[in-house]
A protein has these predicted regions:
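Residues that define the transmembrane beta-barrel architecture of outer-membrane proteins
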Residues: 21-23, 42-48, 86-92, 121-125, ...
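Outer membrane beta-barrel transmembrane domains
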Residues: 101-129
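Flexible, solvent-exposed loop segments that connect beta-strands
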Residues: 31-42, 69-89, 116-120, 149
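Transmembrane beta-barrel strands of outer-membrane/channel proteins
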Residues: 27-33, 63-67, 96, 108-112, ...
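Outer-membrane beta-barrel "beta-signal"
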Residues: 24, 28, 105, 129-137, ...
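Short glycine/proline- and aromatic-enriched beta-strand/turn motifs that initiate or cap beta-hairpins
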Residues: 18-60, 155-161
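Outer-membrane beta-barrel strand-turn architecture
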Residues: 53-58, 98-104, 130-135, 144, ...
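Cleavable N-terminal export/targeting peptides
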Residues: 1-24
Length: 162
């Protein structure tokens, strides 16, 4: 009886593992250089998180959740120095990517950035280009966060995928 149950179980588990070969996940770190008005009020940012992707031929679906920090600058306004606020942000992104060449891809993500300082949220829009060799994934991107203000930055993201 055990052999009768074990053989179908092994077959099903082998099929399931074969289907998951297009799935990857892992930690990432990123550096961010503010642009536009955001550059005038905040220092360079950094962050970390975890991401996942499902590869479907040349296309794929991506998702990530992380933490980012942008320190505030001291800005001279009129007769005094003003301390600009720092931002602690939890970005949640989903997107698509398309493999342009064996190791090069283009990516487009969207999502929500949650500002932990004041409990506000912003819409995320982020195009990027990346290279993935074995488990190392490096991406250059432009990211825009939009609510009643606009926060934009150039970013460099490095991930290890399992």
């Amino acid at each position: 009886m055990t052999k009768v149950l074990l053989i179908p179980l092994l077959f099903v588990s082998t099929v399931c593992v074969a289907q998951l070969k297009g799935f990857g996940f892992g930690p990432y770190v990123e550096a961010a250089w503010p642009s536009g008005d955001f550059k005038q009020s905040n220092k360079n940012g950094f962050g970390a998180g975890i991401g996942a992707d499902i590869r479907l031929g040349k296309a794929g679906v991506t998702g990530s959740v992380g933490y980012m920090y942008f320190g505030g600058k001291t800005v001279y306004t009129g007769n005094e120095n003003t301390e600009m606020p720092s931002y602690n942000v939890i970005p949640v992104r989903v997107g698509i990517k398309y493999r342009l060449a064996p190791a090069i891809y283009a990516k487009l993500e969207s999502g929500v950035a949650r500002f932990t300082n004041d409990k506000e949220s912003a819409l995320i829009f982020s195009p990027g280009l990346g290279i993935r060799i074995l488990g190392l994934d490096v991406q250059a991107k432009y990211e825009l966060w939009k609510n009643d203000q606009t926060f934009s930055f150039l970013g460099l993201k490095a991930a290890i995928n399992f």
